Swiss-Prot record:
Pfam families for the chain: Forkhead
Annotated InterPro entries: Fork_head_dom (IPR001766), TF_fork_head_CS_2 (IPR030456), WH-like_DNA-bd_sf (IPR036388), WH_DNA-bd_sf (IPR036390)
Chain positions found as Phosphoserine: S185, S253, S256, S257, S262
Protein's organism: Drosophila mojavensis (Fruit fly)
Stretches the record annotates as Disordered: 1-72, 177-243, 317-371
Main localisation: cytoplasm
GO cellular component: cytoplasm; nucleus
The name this protein goes by in its record: Forkhead box protein O
DNA-binding region residue numbers: 90-196
Sequence positions bearing Phosphothreonine: T43
Keywords, ordered alphabetically: Activator, Cell cycle, Cytoplasm, Developmental protein, Differentiation, DNA-binding, Growth regulation, Nucleus, Phosphoprotein, Transcription, Transcription regulation
Functional note: Transcription factor involved in the regulation of the insulin signaling pathway. Consistently activates both the downstream target Thor\d4EBP and the feedback control target InR. Involved in negative regulation of the cell cycle, modulating cell growth and proliferation. In response to cellular stresses, such as nutrient deprivation or increased levels of reactive oxygen species, foxo is activated and inhibits growth through the action of target genes such as Thor.
Length: 563
């Protein structure tokens, strides 16, 4: 207090505009009142420790590790930082520094995770009483976090099976403060490189004479590119900032701004594969269009046959159950209400079914009467559906058989047309026939004459052939060469009989093939009927199971899905 009792110096007062620095310079200075820097908040800060230079400390620790004395390195690091405040409870070293000392102290410069834990407990006094499982969860988690976070540590697979991996110091890590692994979105170097490449590409295209960003027709890129025409003096027109030709805002899209699309084709930034850019308009003739329409219609009819059958019936297995969530629980009511429900199915009138049903409520028992009636209705509807399916399949089978019979009749009609050359009724009377010349001419072929006569034609003209044979026999008997005539007639008859037998065999084979085809079609139809019946049985069983599981005992009000 004696210092404050001294008189303060009297400053000379002057009005001649002296500077403040000159006035302050005349004041006595004291070592304890040196000017201090102020923070950005313009308040005098409390004295705080100076920031620790982590780069120097890491270099010192790395040098001590290179000398091979981790304990001395820890002591030197603590001595260098004795004037600063402690960063952690055990000292100024971080978890990464402790792990580095632990790995560097090993003989082979590698440790497992459990060995790092043991080194911490043995060498750091703070962790000596925290080695048990209850108190070590926190700092062990921090060690694992730092091992996976820093680039200076690398993980090496252990040679033995079932053993933990080795942790070693990464020799390729940068010296000084270790760089933390960042996410891909935080690394801006790649983004800057990509952005620079885009700028260079756009500038090269612009220098080559490619213009078309801001033409008369606006492009759906962005409001910035659209405003460049209205503000030609904008700095965006300068060469320092160029928009990409395919630039588009995130909010806009081609779907939302299709009316504002520019007809100008985008710049050829994609590789050219040699294909023409504008494809010609291919037009089909009317005949091709009709053929395609018929083909599409037949395919659509075949695909939608089953669905149309179900729609015509007006009843499906899935539509027979309510799909709405159950309402909240209500107290049970003893009187039951009987309500008529109409099922639009074949063979069922709207008033022919009367059931007792209610939606599924929790904490309620199923009603046997309502279950039985509802299941009976569903079974009857399923049976009607099966009967309709069988009828439709029978109709299809009959149509197929009718078509096959029509084809067979047409073939028979074609084969049964009599050949005019062999029809003797068409010849007029009074004709003369030189039988001797005819027999002589036929015998000259040495039995190689082949006459193909259809079976129907032979059947219709059998009497005529027999008459002609008799006439030839009589004429030959009257002639001098009766023996030769009889032998030739017998040869002709034998040939005709052989041909008739061959034709009969061929027709029998054709009939057998047709019968086999009909049997195969019947087997396929029967298999389809069995599959449909099995599917209907399973569907009805599933419906019965679902009905028994969801129906309640007490009826309070009709379900909302019934109309």
């Amino acid at each position: 207090m004696d210092d404050f009792a001294q008189e303060w110096p009297n400053l000379p007062r002057s009005d001649n505009g002296l500077q403040m620095d000159q006035l302050v310079g005349d004041l006595p200075t004291d070592g304890g009142f040196e000017p201090q820097t102020r923070a950005r908040s313009n308040t005098w800060p409390c004295p705080r420790p100076e920031p620790v230079d982590e780069l120097d400390s890491t270099k010192a620790s790395n040098q001590q590790l290179a000398n091979g004395d981790p304990q001395q390195a820890m002591q030197n690091a603590n001595a260098a930082k004795k004037n600063s405040s402690r960063r952690n409870a055990w000292g100024n070293l971080s978890y990464a520094d402790l792990i580095t000392h632990a790995i560097g102290s090993a003989t082979d410069k590698r440790l497992t995770l459990s060995q790092i834990y043991e080194w911490m407990v043995q060498n750091v006094s703070y962790f000596k009483d925290k080695g048990d499982s209850n108190s070590s969860a926190g700092w062990k988690n921090s060690i694992r976090h730092n091992l996976s976070l820093h680039n200076r540590f690398m993980r090496v697979q252990n040679e033995g099976t079932g053993k933990s991996s080795w942790w070693m110091l990464n020799p390729e890590a940068k010296p000084g403060k270790s760089v933390r692994r960042r996410a891909a979105s935080m690394e801006t170097s790649r983004y800057e490189k990509r952005r620079g490449r885009a700028k260079k590409r756009v500038e090269a295209l612009r220098q080559a004479g490619v213009v078309g960003l801001n033409d008369a027709t606006p492009s759906p890129s962005s409001s910035v590119s659209e405003g460049l025409d209205h503000f030609p003096e904008s700095p965006l027109h300068s060469g320092s900032y160029q928009l990409s030709p395919d630039f588009r805002q995130r909010a806009s899209s081609n779907a939302s701004s299709c009316g504002r699309l520019s007809p100008i084709r985008a710049l050829d930034l994609e590789p050219d594969w040699g294909f023409p850019v504008d494809y010609p308009n291919t037009t089909l003739t009317q005949a091709q269009v009709q053929v395609f329409d018929q083909l599409a219609g037949s395919m659509a009819d075949e695909l939608k046959l089953h669905t149309d059958m179900l729609q015509q019936q007006g009843f499906s297995a899935a539509s027979g159950l309510p799909t709405q969530p159950p309402p909240p629980y209500q107290p049970p009511q003893h009187p039951q209400h009987t309500q008529g429900y109409a099922l639009n199915g074949p063979g069922l009138s709207p008033n022919s079914v009367t059931t007792t049903m209610s939606p599924a409520y929790p904490n309620s028992e199923p009603s046997s009467d309502s279950l039985n009636t509802y299941s009976n209705v569903l079974l009857e509807a399923a049976a009607d559906n099966a009967a309709l399916l069988v009828q439709q399949q029978q109709q299809q089978q009959q149509q197929q058989q009718h078509a096959s019979t029509l084809i067979g009749q047409c073939l028979e009609a074609l084969n049964s047309e009599p050949i005019e050359e062999f029809n003797l009724e068409n010849f007029q009377g009074g004709l003369e026939c030189n039988v001797e010349e005819l027999l002589h001419q036929e015998l000259c072929y040495d039995g190689m004459l082949d006459i193909n006569i259809p079976l129907a034609a032979v059947n219709t003209n059998a009497t005529n052939v027999i008459l002609t044979n008799n006439s030839t026999n009589s004429s030959s008997s009257n002639s001098n060469n009766s023996v030769a005539g009889n032998s030739s007639a017998n040869l002709q008859l034998s040939q005709l009989q052989a041909q008739l037998q061959l034709q009969q065999q061929q027709q029998q084979q054709q009939q057998q093939q047709q019968q086999q085809q009909q049997q195969q079609q019947q087997l396929l139809l029967s298999n389809n009927n069995n599959n449909n019946n099995n599917s209907l049985d399973t569907a009805s069983a599933n419906l019965n199971a679902r009905v028994q599981y969801t129906q309640p005992s007490v009826v309070t009000s009709p379900p909302s899905w019934v109309h």
